[in-house]
Design a protein with these regions (language model features):
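Conserved S-adenosyl-L-methionine
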Residues: 145-155
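Residues lining the SAM
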Residues: 81-84, 110
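A short glycine-rich, Lys/Arg-flanked "PGG" loop and its adjoining helix->strand segment in the class I
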Residues: 92-106
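Short, glycine-/aromatic-enriched active-site segment of Class I SAM-dependent methyltransferases
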Residues: 107-129, 133-138
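A structural helix-start
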Residues: 87-91, 111
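Conserved N-terminal segment of class I S-adenosyl-L-methionine
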Residues: 1-81, 91-94, 179, 183, ...
């Protein structure tokens, strides 16, 4: 869904920064779909950054807390994928992104959605919050952006997610069950995602979903 959004709204970018790039998995996919562009990755944890550098040696990486970013009008597009829910001062990070983007640059965000899906999984994952669509849009607009589009995803699986999370105890080891999908469940999940992406391409928007994607523009 991330690649689809970038192709739709910022296919002609030259400089792309991913905040909280982890081990570089998403940047690698971006590099595959948009070869020849300049890719940058910021990551707070050095261990993940080491893996990212091995995975994508042609990209530029920094060990950096997103709040400390001081770039000015440097990037055509910035992505933060399941990142800002971990940060207390998410408003400041969004402002940093606004400052770092060139005029007419795009911001791509994915976040976990709906506090009523909160469970021990979120606590184990060190989430500060799960967003509502309205909350995320308001914070993005307060940073100076214009929201271009927003939609829930992982929507077809919400009933299963809700049942699963109601059954989770507060035990850390049980929370890990959501992080370890069996191979057949992973295949099923990918099939559902393909269906949702197809529907999004046709113009559908989902009102609820386990996650939320938002695209915004710096005018």
């Amino acid at each position: 869904i991330i690649i689809w959004a970038i192709k739709k709204y910022a296919a002609n970018f030259r400089d792309f920064l991913e905040i909280g790039c982890g081990t570089g998995f998403v940047l690698q996919a971006i590099n595959k779909n948009f070869p020849g562009n300049n890719l940058f990755g910021d990551e707070y944890f050095e261990e993940g950054l080491a893996h990212a550098k091995k995975r994508l040696p042609e990209a530029s990486f920094r060990c950096l807390d997103a709040i400390q970013m001081q770039d000015q009008a440097r990037y055509d597009a910035i992505g933060a994928f399941d990142v800002i829910e971990h940060i207390e001062d998410d408003k400041l990070v969004l402002l940093r992104c606004f400052q770092a983007l060139k005029k007419d640059g795009f911001l791509f965000l994915t976040v976990p959605q709906h506090m009523w899906l909160w469970s021990s999984f979120d606590e184990y994952s060190c989430h500060v919050r799960r967003y509502s669509s309205l909350e995320l849009m308001q914070k993005v607009e307060q940073a100076g952006f214009q929201v271009v589009t927003s939609s829930s995803f992982i929507s077809l699986l919400v009933p299963l997610m809700w049942l699963s999370r109601r059954r989770l105890s507060q035990k850390k080891e049980e929370s890990m069950t959501e992080l370890k999908l069996s191979s057949w469940l992973n295949i099923f999940f990918m099939m559902v995602m393909k269906v949702e992406i197809m529907l999004l391409k046709l113009g559908a928007k989902f009102p609820i979903g386990g996650s939320l994607i938002l695209v915004a523009k710096k005018l």
